[in-house]
């Protein structure tokens, strides 16, 4: 829920600041700024909630902590890439692929009742997918519209 709030609030703030400062609004840029802010937030989670994030990674994959930190770093790099005219398109394409690839980890987290912030097995369970899957589709669509369309 926090990433969604950050996405919408930063989008609205970006629009307001553009309108006040420039008397015009670049909605695509505002959308990329909002997506970048959201990615900074989610990247922070990779460093703050390491144990819970490790629990999301399938058991057959070794070096779970490496994956957690690496994806956090990738999210930070993507946040930067979204802000430059020369890189936002490739960043958007790679982000869409990333969002598709991480969905199984979110599904596994729900199936195992993983509470990411606590690193425990008392999370909301499968009912969370009714929110998470549409949210992931929103992130993919948002990324497409502000970077590739």
Task: Describe the residue ranges of each PLM region.
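Membrane-interface extramembranous regions
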Residues: 1-149
């Amino acid at each position: 829920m926090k990433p969604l709030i950050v996405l919408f609030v930063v989008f609205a703030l970006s629009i307001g600041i553009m309108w006040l400062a420039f008397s015009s609004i670049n909605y695509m840029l505002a959308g990329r700024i909002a997506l970048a802010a959201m990615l900074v937030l989610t990247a922070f989670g990779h460093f703050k909630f390491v144990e819970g994030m490790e629990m999301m990674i399938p058991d057959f994959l070794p070096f779970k902590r490496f994956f957690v930190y690496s994806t956090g770093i990738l999210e930070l790099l993507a946040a930067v890439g979204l802000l430059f005219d020369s890189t936002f398109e490739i960043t958007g394409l790679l982000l869409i692929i990333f969002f598709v690839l991480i969905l199984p980890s979110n599904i596994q987290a729900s199936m195992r009742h993983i509470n990411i912030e606590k690193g425990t097995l008392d999370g909301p369970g499968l009912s969370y997918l009714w929110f998470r899957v549409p949210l992931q589709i929103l992130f993919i669509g948002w990324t497409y519209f502000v970077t590739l369309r």
